[in-house]
Curated annotation (Swiss-Prot):
This is Probable dual-specificity RNA methyltransferase RlmN. It comes from Ruminiclostridium cellulolyticum (strain ATCC 35319 / DSM 5812 / JCM 6584 / H10) (Clostridium cellulolyticum). GO terms for cellular component: cytoplasm. One of its GO terms (molecular function) is rRNA binding. Reaction proceeds by a ping-pong mechanism involving intermediate methylation of a conserved cysteine residue. GO terms for biological process: rRNA base methylation; tRNA methylation.
Length: 349
């Protein structure tokens, strides 16, 4: 059965045309779906006959909130959602000066295997549909009562490993009859899937691309990120340069500051050399503590020194604010804990 949450306006128009309905009905239904309704009966300007016909061939499938963690030190809220098939994902709602930002997941789990990331810990289940990505934004907006104006695809999963569904989601969430979130207010974070970066450069979608770099050296990056064994740093930087030239958009390079691993002055100088002359920005991220990987965040002194070296070499650099640190707001850990506890319960029953 078709989930209407996954459909673009054009797809709805085609579907309604095949049902013998006028084109304007599709826009009415699209608006209802994107307003957050949970039942066909909520479509008050649609005839009962059409609602009944729709209910026979389609559904409106919504997420279920399993858990909600509210930070005591800021307004950050972490959500644990259950999908229709029982899979679990995470999202985070964050408040900034410019308003509210939704950090959403693109997959149930991740197959990239980055050593410092909790998303990989519980394994990969499947890609999320466009509707499941959209619903994370809608449900957090409904639950909080706050308008979400920015989205970051930095939750569980590698967005470019779910390319077609992510592109479709972006078009739905940006639509003027939908949530109407501007493309320039959307960021997509990738571990560096080079062919997809090159494909994204041709899409004419002016989002912000963030690339998880974390080292300027192949040996160090490969040890932390298996994807580097397939797409080495030279290939990645080459693709990023093509992206900036094609889109005229600045790339953000994310750099997790890990004590004793990649936070030395030499690491900073190597990074500055790698990025010299690029249209880019570096975001230094104090690494989150993830059970089992042994990584610890760099000291503030190390981070500030690293930042100063980059800036002295002409690289624009910021340090990410640690929102929701008391609830471990980085995505993946809560899902892993939930899956582990369920597994233990089944094993001991």
């Amino acid at each position: 059965m078709i989930n209407l949450m996954n459909m673009t306006l054009e797809e709805l128009e085609q579907m309604l045309s095949e049902m013998g309905q006028q084109k304007f009905r599709a826009k009415q239904i699209f608006k209802w779906i994107n307003s957050g309704i949970r039942s066909f009966s909520d479509m008050t300007n649609i005839s009962k006959q059409l609602r009944d016909e729709l209910e026979k061939v389609s559904k409106i499938s919504r997420l279920k909130i399993v858990d909600r963690l509210q930070s005591k030190i800021d307004s950050t809220v972490k959500y644990l959602f259950e999908l229709e098939d029982g899979n679990i994902i995470e999202s985070v709602l964050m408040e900034y000066k410019h308003g509210f930002t939704a950090c959403i997941s693109s997959q149930a789990g991740c197959r990239m295997g980055c050593k410092f990331c909790a998303s990989t810990g519980a394994g990969f289940s499947r890609n999320l549909t466009p509707g499941e990505m959209l619903d994370q934004v809608m449900t957090m907006q409904e639950d909080s009562g706050n308008r979400i104006g920015h989205i970051v695809l930095m939750g569980i999963g590698e967005p470019l490993d779910n390319y077609e569904n992510v592109i479709k989601f972006l078009k739905i969430v940006n639509h003027p009859d939908g949530l109407m979130i501007g493309m320039r207010n959307i960021s997509l974070s990738t571990c560096g899937v080079v062919p997809r970066i090159l494909q994204l450069a041709k899409e004419n979608i002016p989002i912000t691309l963030s690339v998880s770099l974390h080292s300027a050296r192949d040996d160090k990056r490969s040890a932390m990120m298996p994807v580097n064994k397939t797409y080495c740093i030279d290939k990645l930087i080459s693709a990023c340069k093509i992206y900036t030239v094609s889109t005229k958009r600045r790339i953000t390079f994310e750099y997790a500051m890990i004590l004793g691993e990649n936070d030395s002055e030499q690491d900073a100088r190597e990074l500055a050399g790698l990025l010299k002359g690029m249209l880019c920005h570096v975001n230094l991220i104090p690494v989150n503590t993830v059970t089992g990987n042994g990584y610890k965040k760099s000291s503030r002194i190390h981070i500030d020194k690293f930042k100063n070296i980059l800036e002295s070499k002409g690289i624009e650099t910021t340090v990410r604010r640690e929102l929701g640190s008391d609830i471990n707001a980085a995505c993946g850990q809560l899902r892993k804990n939930k899956i582990d506890s369920t597994t233990n319960l089944l094993l001991n029953s």
